[in-house]
């Protein structure tokens, strides 16, 4: 009998979030009386196409997450909690090592992005099955300048070609594993998973995301995040075009 393919999400929550100005990990800050990380995990917990979640947290926080988030809120799809590394790519690599052989598609998502929607997740999985590699992104709204070390403008790229990349980033598992193996072999670095996949020779497709899918990074983001939750409770979707 053939083994059914799985869709796994690696939720990366190992960063300390120094820009938040807190003494503890930003993913544990409360929104609506629940940790940000809970809100993120709950989206994937409720998604019918997600079979399991691998949660990557800062070293030493594994037991806390098991007790205070996973067990406390009854999250059944979190199969494994693993310690992250010194950099994001190390944390993702640790998560990849926990993938089961049956996993065909893997999503990588920031633990501090709790406002991703079911619809965007579904579309990104669909495209990943078809194309192999996909990122979620939105067109930039502002004019972007390249600036040198003297604080001089050196270039103004065409805004129509610029997209702000979010997560999840979604791949056939074999593609992402190969990209990370080559990154290790050739000492490649990148700020996201797609950079490593591109460097390995794959084409990465783009799925249109939503502007609400912010990464909660600064105190101001908490205010915006509360506004998003309030809008959603009222059955609305924020339109910040």
Curated annotation (Swiss-Prot):
Annotated site (Positions MEP for the nucleophilic attack), which positions? 159, 215
* Keyword line: Isoprene biosynthesis, Nucleotidyltransferase, Transferase
**What processes does the entry annotate via GO biological process terms?**
isopentenyl diphosphate biosynthetic process, methylerythritol 4-phosphate pathway
Q: Which InterPro entries match?
A: IspD (IPR001228), IspD/TarI (IPR034683), IspD/TarI_cytidylyltransf_bact (IPR050088), ISPD_synthase_CS (IPR018294), Nucleotide-diphossugar_trans (IPR029044)
Q: Which reaction does it catalyse?
A: 2-C-methyl-D-erythritol 4-phosphate + CTP + H(+) = 4-CDP-2-C-methyl-D-erythritol + diphosphate
Q: What is its EC number?
A: 2.7.7.60
Which PROSITE patterns has this protein been placed in?
ISPD
Q: In which pathway does it act?
A: Isoprenoid biosynthesis; isopentenyl diphosphate biosynthesis via DXP pathway; isopentenyl diphosphate from 1-deoxy-D-xylulose 5-phosphate: step 2/6
- Specify the domain of life of the species encoding this protein: Bacteria
Q: What Pfam families does the database record attribute to this sequence?
A: IspD
Q: Name one GO molecular function term.
A: 2-C-methyl-D-erythritol 4-phosphate cytidylyltransferase activity
Which residues does the annotation list for site: Transition state stabilizer? 19, 26
Its job:
Catalyzes the formation of 4-diphosphocytidyl-2-C-methyl-D-erythritol from CTP and 2-C-methyl-D-erythritol 4-phosphate (MEP).
Q: Supply the PANTHER family for this chain.
A: 2-C-METHYL-D-ERYTHRITOL 4-PHOSPHATE CYTIDYLYLTRANSFERASE, CHLOROPLASTIC
Identify its protein family. Answer: Belongs to the IspD/TarI cytidylyltransferase family. IspD subfamily.
What is the protein name for this chain? 2-C-methyl-D-erythritol 4-phosphate cytidylyltransferase
């Amino acid at each position: 009998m053939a083994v059914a393919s799985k869709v796994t999400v690696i939720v990366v929550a190992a960063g300390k979030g120094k820009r938040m100005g807190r003494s503890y990990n930003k993913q544990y800050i409360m929104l609506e009386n629940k940790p940000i990380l809970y809100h993120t995990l709950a989206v994937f917990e409720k998604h019918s196409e997600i079979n399991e979640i691998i949660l990557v947290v800062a070293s030493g926080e594994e037991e806390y997450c098991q007790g205070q988030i996973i067990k406390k809120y009854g999250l059944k799809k979190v199969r494994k909690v693993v310690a992250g590394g010194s950099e994001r790519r190390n944390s993702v690599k640790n998560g990849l090592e926990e993938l089961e052989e049956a996993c065909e598609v893997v999503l990588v998502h920031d633990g501090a992005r709790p406002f991703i929607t079911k619809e965007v997740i579904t579309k990104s999985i669909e495209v990943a099955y078809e194309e192999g590699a996909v990122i979620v992104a939105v067109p930039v709204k502002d004019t972007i300048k390249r600036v040198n070390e003297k604080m001089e403008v050196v270039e103004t790229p065409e805004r129509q070609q610029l997209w702000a990349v979010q997560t999840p980033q979604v791949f056939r598992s074999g593609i992402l594993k190969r990209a990370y193996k080559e990154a290790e072999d050739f000492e490649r670095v990148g700020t996201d998973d797609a950079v490593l996949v591109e460097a390995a020779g794959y084409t990465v497709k783009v799925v249109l995301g939503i502007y609400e899918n912010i990464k909660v990074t600064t105190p101001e983001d908490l205010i915006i995040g509360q506004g998003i939750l309030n809008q959603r409770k009222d059955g609305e979707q924020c339109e910040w075009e």
